Amino acid sequence: MSEDSSALPWSINRDDYELQEVIGSGATAVVQAAYCAPKKERVAIKRINLEKCQTSMDELLKEIQAMSQCHHPNIVSYYTSFVVKDELWLVMKLLSGGSVLDIIKHIVAKGEHKGGVLDESTIATILREVLEGLEYLHKNGQIHRDVKAGNILLGEDGSVQIADFGVSAFLATGGDITRNKVRKTFVGTPCWMAPEVMEQVRGYDFKADIWSFGITAIELATGAAPYHKYPPMKVLMLTLQNDPPSLDTGVQDKEMLKKYGKSFRKMISLCLQKDPEKRPTAAELLRHKFFQKAKNKEFLQEKILQRAPTISERSKKVRRVPGSSGRLHKTEDGGWEWSDDEFDEESEEGKAAISQLRSCPTQQHCLCLLQLFSAADPMGTLLQVPEQISAHLPQPASQMPTQPAQVSLLPPAEPAKPAQARSSGERSQETKVPISLVLRLRNSKKELNDIRFEFTPGRDTAEGVSQELISAGLVDGRDLVIVAANLQKIVEEPQSNRSVTFKLASGVEGSDIPDDGKLIGFAQLSIS
């Protein structure tokens, strides 16, 4: 590169960029290599479709301006941005080594992962650089919100940089991002998402990135996130209900994990603590014993870049039509597939989610997943109750009623029938027989309600029914996951789980004290 070309500012003229191979894609964006003629330099251009983006350009440009002021060797450099028709083009540094996810897939495809995908020294070297980048972001009041192998890029010299900082998350929130350090926006990929981000109750801070970092550490060793086989809603349930995942979670062949030692496992467990306050900061993690195994970038260059697929090899695997957008996107073969903002339909979790969607019997129950990952801020007030349902709700009273008010969602022609005791084998043969249930909880006026409804195995889904209860204004939107999880528990084992009491994510208000007996901050779901 000549001195003259290097001194030139980055062009904002579309004609100065020659688009080349597609090297990555998501539902709302495509990333292409390009050649910038005035600068005589190859770059990466992320083309974001603005068609469905609710963010004003003024707000979006402010965020990009803040992003462009981030200068760190472990953060991908953003050069400039401009609008081309209905797309926002982000011009970035091209890292020709691709993502760590590309390398993981390449190793797995060649069958070279039987003893673990990457060794400890390689993992430590990559993750130390990621921590340096996260420490910089966190010190500057920024949260990445989507740390994963697919967003860790490698340069041909073995350098490591974090990508997709800022803009993807900003677009997903409709621009509703303040500069404070606590977020209440629901963005990120479910498998890597921290529990507090899923709960949407207290908001979250930079410690959410530390959880995602821990999941990424597992991904680099095993080749996938712990719950990668499950569709998004199931991932949310497992993360919230189960103990934190570990290196062994979901791995059938434990032999592949034998070479990973105690310090690596301990580092992961520190990151994956459900209480974010107990997780270490990026700066504290950098002092962890495990990172003494880290080498330099020449080590990465020799160790894994020689095994990595080339840009042209990676580009052949991108099947989505560039420029397609939306939650349901069209593929090259003309079919439609669902994904979240940056969902990789080649990944295991992508396949599971798409399979879940295709098996949905009705559009009504498919919508729950689409709404869960919509750009709208999920932290709004309780949904308004439609008039036809509000007529059945109890009227305001000075004291809480001794008997719960009855709210029925059962079809008028088919009154609720008591579920008869049947063996699990008999029930599986009679999948069309509905289970009558009652959800008892307090409404916004603190009055007890009994909400009666039916669940038909083989037709209904727990998340679909829960979404309907929320849409009817009977359940707080923040309780979607916890209600769905307990409904799933009952319908899977109706004989052993005829009634469950559980804590609500929406919690209690003011001076109220949670009480599972009086159902203050709790709900009860039973087979009637």
Curated annotation (Swiss-Prot):
* Protein kinase domain ranges (all copies): 17-291
Describe the family membership recorded for this protein in Swiss-Prot or TrEMBL: Belongs to the protein kinase superfamily. STE Ser/Thr protein kinase family. STE20 subfamily.
Q: Name one GO biological process term.
A: osmosensory signaling pathway
Which Pfam families would you find in this protein's record? OSR1_C, Pkinase
Reported function: Effector serine/threonine-protein kinase component of the WNK-SPAK/OSR1 kinase cascade, which is involved in various processes, such as ion transport, response to hypertonic stress and blood pressure. Specifically recognizes and binds proteins with a RFXV motif. Acts downstream of WNK kinases (WNK1, WNK2, WNK3 or WNK4): following activation by WNK kinases, catalyzes phosphorylation of ion cotransporters, such as SLC12A1/NKCC2, SLC12A2/NKCC1, SLC12A3/NCC, SLC12A5/KCC2 or SLC12A6/KCC3, regulating their activity.
Phosphoserine: modified positions = S324, S325, S339, S347, S359, S428
Alphabetized InterPro entries for the sequence: Kinase-like_dom_sf, Kinase_OSR1/WNK_CCT, Prot_kinase_dom, Protein_kinase_ATP_BS, STE20/SPS1-PAK
- What are the annotated GO cellular component locations? cytoplasm; cytosol
Q: Where is the composition biased (Acidic residues)?
A: 334-348
- Write the Enzyme Commission number(s) for this entry: 2.7.11.1
Where ATP is bound, by residue? I23, G24, S25, G26, A27, T28, A29, V30, V31, K46
Biased-composition ranges for Polar residues? 396-406
Q: Which SUPFAM superfamilies match?
A: Protein kinase-like (PK-like)
Residue numbers carrying N-acetylserine? S2
- What is the regulation of this protein's activity? Activated following phosphorylation by WNK kinases (WNK1, WNK2, WNK3 or WNK4).
Catalytic residues in the record: D146 (proton acceptor)
Which cofactor(s) are needed, names only? Mg(2+)
The protein in question is named Serine/threonine-protein kinase OSR1
Q: Could you describe the post-translational modifications of this protein? A: Phosphorylation at Thr-185 by WNK kinases (WNK1, WNK2, WNK3 or WNK4) is required for activation. Autophosphorylated; promoting its activity.
Output the Gene Ontology terms for molecular function. Answer: ATP binding; identical protein binding; magnesium ion binding; protein kinase binding; protein serine/threonine kinase activity
